[in-house]
Regions:
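Intracellular loop-helix junctions on the cytosolic face of multi-pass helical membrane proteins
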Residues: 1-25, 117-128, 141, 145-281, ...
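Short amphipathic helix-loop junctions that connect adjacent transmembrane helices
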Residues: 48-63, 278-297
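Loop-to-transmembrane helix entry/capping segments in MFS-fold secondary transporters
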Residues: 62-63, 124, 150, 154-166, ...
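Central cavity-lining transmembrane alpha-helices of secondary-active solute carriers
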Residues: 65-86, 106, 175, 304-316
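Glycine-rich segments within core transmembrane alpha-helices of 12-TM secondary carriers
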Residues: 72, 104, 161-185, 303-307, ...
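Cytoplasmic membrane-interface "Motif A"-like loop-to-helix N-cap segments
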Residues: 85-103, 321-336, 385-391
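C-terminal ends and interior cores of transmembrane alpha-helices
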Residues: 95-121, 335-350
Length: 481
């Protein structure tokens, strides 16, 4: 039996749709912790330095470790399907934070524990197995974290705030990670590998705590009886009790033009971030570090220059999100990001102050893109529900995460082959040609990718049409309840 209070409640009166209700505030904190734990600390460490540790301190061939880290894409797609099928009384996402916290933490702690005396084959197998188990476990909580704007609220402003807060969690975590890497590794001056291992276990404990806290604070809008009703409606629409197959699910997505456009823009943005983050560790160590421009802690300095602007920028435009369409924000700042990134590549380190200014500007606009783009995904999911009667938060979000992994894997594999072909065997210096390649991977390719992504995002669903779609969906739900 439906709740008489709930049946008379319009979407805008639901606690999850009120931007500053107690429920929404707890959801913002949960989104912050979720991204801090999934996209921030350990993820930042592994994205930029896992290959460095295995090549420089464990002696693994760069090309081999590059291929190992390029695997692990399909777990995202599979988990998206699982997320849409596995519901609990809490909803679609919340339970995953409790189920996955410990496995993720264990994988993080064990990642750098491979014995130095082991053969190269054993080291590669260690990295292959642990990294892919880590990716699988992380995906099981990372996708629910990505889906929070969609599962927590139907209000555009609340969704935007959820996305912004989550983005802040990523940036704060990445900055903290950048500053603690050097000091913790330096604890073991004669044996830096022990420092990396200690760092891994610190990250493991922090990840476990953050994910459990995120799950404890989270409240989804559609849970319990709501999910049962939605599932019943889908079955009635199909006139069958047979569960929707994977092919059927993707057939809906492939007919959703706005989902396809979002994935095109997401692929470009993912490639930009993939090459930027994937090459950052080597770029700092072999291009910036030898120049002496960044002082004694180049990791901390660059992470600060990259992430502090990303933390500050959202607050500067936050007052305007009620009046400016998220699509316009994404398109404008994506285009500016391309200009600034290509400007960095052209400038190089020859004019250090200009390089830093351009990096700050690029990170500011990049934060605005990352903090707004997921709103376009939630609109695409709403469009799919409006057009086909099927709401696909999990599988609809999974491709975005998979594309991020594709780009990161490609970047890591390319880096590995570039270093291997230059004769680099770990811990040594590189030639000018390798430095030029690292500059292109760190600055040139990200700029090109952002320029192409601007076109895809420019064709995405705007607020005017989305508001009409959302109103019709709310009317349908009110009648069906």
């Amino acid at each position: 039996m439906s709740d008489p209070v709930k049946t008379t409640m319009v979407a805008s009166e639901h606690p999850c749709d009120k931007a500053f209700s107690a429920t929404s505030i707890k959801n913002y904190i949960a989104a912050f912790f979720a991204q801090f734990g999934t996209q921030g600390m350990a993820y930042t460490l592994f994205s930029s330095y896992l290959s460095v540790v295995f090549t420089d301190y464990l002696g693994v061939n760069p090309a081999a470790i590059g291929m190992v880290l390029s695997v692990g894409v399909f777990t995202d797609i599979i988990m998206g399907n699982v997320m849409d099928r596995v519901h609990t009384k809490w909803g679609k996402a919340r339970h995953w934070f409790f189920w996955s916290a410990l496995p993720v933490a264990i994988c993080v702690g064990l990642m750098f524990m491979c014995p130095v005396s082991a053969s190269d084959t054993v080291k590669v197998i260690w990295a292959l197995v642990l990294y892919n188990v880590y990716c699988t476990c992380l995906t099981s909580v990372r996708l629910p974290a990505f889906s929070l704007p969609s599962v927590c609220s139907d209000n555009s402003r609340t969704r935007m705030l959820l996305v912004w807060v989550a983005s802040e969690g990523t940036n704060v975590a990445a900055t903290v990670t950048g500053w603690i890497i050097g000091p913790i590794v330096a604890i073991y001056k004669g044996n830096p590998l022990s420092g990396w291992r200690l760092l891994g276990w610190i990250m493991a404990g922090a990840t476990l705590l953050l994910l459990v806290l995120a799950g404890a604070l989270l409240t989804e809008k559609r849970n319990g009886a709501d999910l049962e009703r939605i599932e019943a409606e889908r079955k009635a629409m199909k006139h069958t009790e047979k569960a929707m197959g994977l092919g059927e699910q993707y057939s809906y997505l492939l007919r959703n033009k706005y989902w396809l456009l979002f994935q095109g823009g997401g692929l470009c943005n993912g490639m930009s971030l993939g090459f930027l983050i994937g090459s950052m560790g080597y770029w700092i160590q072999h291009v910036l570090g030898p120049s002496g421009l960044a002082g004694d802690n180049p990791i901390g300095l660059i992470m600060t220059v990259m992430n502090v602007p990303m933390m500050v920028a959202p607050f500067l435009i936050l007052p305007f999100i009620k009046f400016v369409d998220a699509k316009n924000i994404v398109v404008m700042f994506m285009g500016l990001g391309a200009v600034f990134s290509l400007g960095m590549w052209a400038c190089g380190l020859k004019i250090w102050w200009l390089f830093v200014v351009l990096m700050i500007l690029r990170q500011c606009v990049g934060s605005c893109v990352n903090g707004s783009a997921n709103v376009l995904l939630t609109r695409a999911i709403d469009y799919g529900e409006w057009k086909f009667g099927v709401r696909q938060e999990g599988v609809g979000s999974s491709f975005s995460s998979a594309l991020n992994k594709v780009s990161m894997g490609v970047a890591t594999a390319v880096l590995g082959f570039v270093l291997a072909n230059s004769g680099y065997s770990g811990g040594g210096t590189v030639g000018e040609s390798t430095q030029a390649a690292l500059n292109f991977l760190f600055m040139g390719l990200p700029g090109i990718a952002m320029a192409v992504g601007t076109v895809f995002y420019g064709l995405s669903l705007g607020s005017k049409k989305w508001n009409q779609i959302r109103a019709e969906l709310d009317e349908r739900n009110a009648v069906q309840q």
